[in-house]
């Protein structure tokens, strides 16, 4: 998935945790804000205001990797972006991120 991080600076990964017979859903969502109440996101200056009649465009590209070479290429691109930076995984919501 490719998108402009300056225009879509937030990214959410979520899953539906209902029973398996109900189906399993996961979401990977670039966004202008986090999935919190609008008032909370507004307080944290993450609400994009669009004037009446105005539009805002975002570009998003999704690639499907159908063979080992394509998968290896995607893995290399990710490794190049990560460099030597280790991932940070938090055990609890961080201040300012979650209502």
Q: Over which residues does each language-model region extend?
A:
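Beta-strand-rich recognition/accessory modules
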Residues: 1-99
């Amino acid at each position: 998935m490719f998108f402009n991080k300056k225009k879509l600076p937030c990214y959410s990964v979520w899953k539906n945790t209902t029973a398996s017979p109900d189906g399993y859903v996961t979401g990977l969502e670039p966004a202008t804000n986090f999935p919190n109440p609008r008032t909370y996101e507004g307080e944290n200056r993450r609400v994009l205001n669009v004037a009446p009649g105005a539009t805002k465009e975002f570009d998003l590209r999704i690639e499907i990797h159908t063979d080992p070479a394509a998968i290896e290429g995607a893995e290399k691109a990710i490794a190049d972006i990560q460099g030597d930076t280790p991932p940070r995984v938090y055990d609890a919501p961080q201040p300012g991120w979650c209502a």
